[in-house]
């Protein structure tokens, strides 16, 4: 979508390709995310969010965060809104504080797991949920210059105030501790990889408050190193530390701490599917899982689905994106849902992906059972072999329209026919990066390797050189 030069604030804009993707507006700082463009985003958010209450702004540790937050503040106050800036905080702190304080909404400045050069803007409504597609569309319409109730140029009497409210993060820390009923982790050896990101604001603090024997990696905010060789997308530093220090579990967060992946004491990965199975089994045992239902996405492993069905459970799948998981959970009154990548949503804890909260839940559930994470993982399911390949496809139109590439579509059908009920093919365009994701899953690992290579090569050949 192309946004052309606008002038509701007297600020000229160049053209920029942008829209709300699977997790807000995201792009390269200085290319898409210029101060002028960000100011306009803030202004139109101010037009769309409810009139009553302040608008909260949080951010991760990226070097560009202060610039983005300042430009958003300028746009929001120009729209007459009162702004409370929270400073460095995990993404889930924003919706949690929106609900606690009765705010009109909130914005989180983060590009999640993306590299330091990128940034992004996530927008939450007064209910603490990410904005609906309809409201996102209103903001996009404003950015295109289509009238949606513009209040006119700001004047000396129409501008809203802005306040720094870093102290509000203490409410979020308190909520994290309350989520595990202040259960203790005295002496439990745990490693945390805080990714130089938003988890540094409170991750180590809450685990230490419960008495854990902590080793902390990448534990200071560093906007030039966030997500670089660490965190939930690069688990090797955490794996080395867990094994070398004899920890029984480790947790790695992404840049804004709305998701996490865990490792057991042997360095085995405990992904979002395993978290859903283990936590869901605990809720099931307590008869606290309505309809025995879990909500996951199309990326979740087939081994997980079959094991959950053997427990008498129902697994509902959604498109990729935690907003889809959220919508399905609300509609079906589900207690737990999430993504394989580590976004976990709990109805009892605000229905927002929260990496630190999920890590606390896993740690205390294991400790309460007298088990290490590895011992609990052994009670989980056997995953089908699964491989995900990211094919770089910079051309947005070709990437989003990959289904129209006949050779690639024919190969997908051939793979599905060859693997039958014991395999799956998933090809999807990323909503946040210039990537086409190709995922193959099957009971036969050789088939996984073969078809992953075939489809990735075809995608690279045809989508980047013109589909023929």
Curated annotation (Swiss-Prot):
Phosphoserine sites (modified residues): 112
Catalytic activity of the protein: alpha-D-glucosamine 1-phosphate = D-glucosamine 6-phosphate
EC number: 5.4.2.10
Example of a GO MF term: phosphomannomutase activity
This protein's record includes keyword Cytoplasm: no
Superkingdom of the organism of origin: Bacteria
Cofactor(s), by name: Mg(2+)
Pfam families documented for this protein: PGM_PMM_I (PF02878), PGM_PMM_II (PF02879), PGM_PMM_III (PF02880), PGM_PMM_IV (PF00408)
S-S bonds: none
Residues holding Mg(2+): 112, 254, 256, 258
Keyword line: Isomerase, Magnesium, Metal-binding, Phosphoprotein
CDD domains found in the cross-reference section: GlmM (cd05802)
Record PTM text: Activated by phosphorylation.
Cofactor note: Binds 1 Mg(2+) ion per subunit.
Entry coiled-coil feature ranges: none
Enzyme active site: 112
Entry's Gene Ontology cellular component terms: cytosol
GO annotation terms (biological process): carbohydrate metabolic process; peptidoglycan biosynthetic process; UDP-N-acetylglucosamine biosynthetic process
Role, per record: Catalyzes the conversion of glucosamine-6-phosphate to glucosamine-1-phosphate.
UniProt record similarity statement: Belongs to the phosphohexose mutase family.
Protein name: Phosphoglucosamine mutase
Organism ancestry: Bacteria, Bacillati, Cyanobacteriota, Cyanophyceae, Synechococcales
Gene: glmM
